[in-house]
């Protein structure tokens, strides 16, 4: 048996986008069981805990944690407004198939996002738990300029609140990398890093 040294930077993400049928109570119970199992062999390992209902940020308040368990980063996903981020995706009821939806970054477009992220920040501060926006992004059916404005605004808001974040995705419908051309979407990367 070969031993491998595992860095402290390896985090365990317990469940990604837990199924809605599990519900908050079922998810909290499952988290507690998984944490107990993991702590037997990894007492100091940082854990990433997702929120109920497919990882939605509005369900943060439904999470419960085992007593004295603080080495946790809470993760929520954020894809609002859905009509923009998921436009023209046939599998999404709110996708407005056949319509191009732009995001101009107006005060009216920003206000609900700011309200949602303010809620997340209050929860994080009141619970003394760090928050990671584990997924956010825009499908490639959106126009590039709208994507750039959205990415810059979102990154600015996450930084302002001290949230870590991960863009979705590397490839595919939301991807920053084109597998056929083997090129990165430089405009999106600029928007994500130079806000």
Can you name each region flagged by the protein language model?
Residues 1-107, 114-139, 160-166:
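Active-site region of glycoside hydrolase catalytic domains
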Residues 143-195:
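Aromatic-rich peripheral "rim/lid" segments of glycoside hydrolase catalytic domains that contact
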Residues 53, 113, 191-195:
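Generic hydrophobic, helix-prone segments enriched in Leu/Val/Ile
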């Amino acid at each position: 048996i070969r031993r491998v040294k595992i860095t402290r930077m390896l985090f365990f993400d317990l469940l990604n986008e837990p199924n809605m049928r599990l519900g908050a109570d079922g998810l909290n119970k499952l988290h507690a069981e998984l944490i107990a199992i993991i702590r037997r062999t990894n007492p100091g390992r940082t854990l990433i805990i997702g929120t109920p209902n497919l990882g939605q940020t509005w369900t943060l308040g439904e999470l419960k944690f085992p007593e004295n368990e603080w080495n946790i980063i809470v993760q929520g996903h954020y894809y609002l407004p859905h009509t923009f981020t998921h436009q023209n995706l046939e599998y999404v009821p709110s996708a407005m198939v056949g319509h191009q939806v732009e995001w101009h970054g107006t005060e009216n477009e920003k206000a609900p996002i700011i309200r949602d992220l303010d809620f997340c920040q209050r929860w994080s501060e009141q619970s003394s738990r760090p928050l990671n926006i584990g997924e956010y992004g825009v499908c490639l059916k959106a126009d590039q300029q709208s994507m750039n404005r959205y990415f810059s605004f979102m990154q600015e808001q996450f930084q302002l609140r001290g949230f870590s974040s991960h863009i979705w995705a590397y490839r595919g419908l939301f991807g920053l990398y084109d597998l056929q051309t083997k090129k990165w979407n430089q405009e999106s990367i600029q928007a994500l890093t130079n806000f």
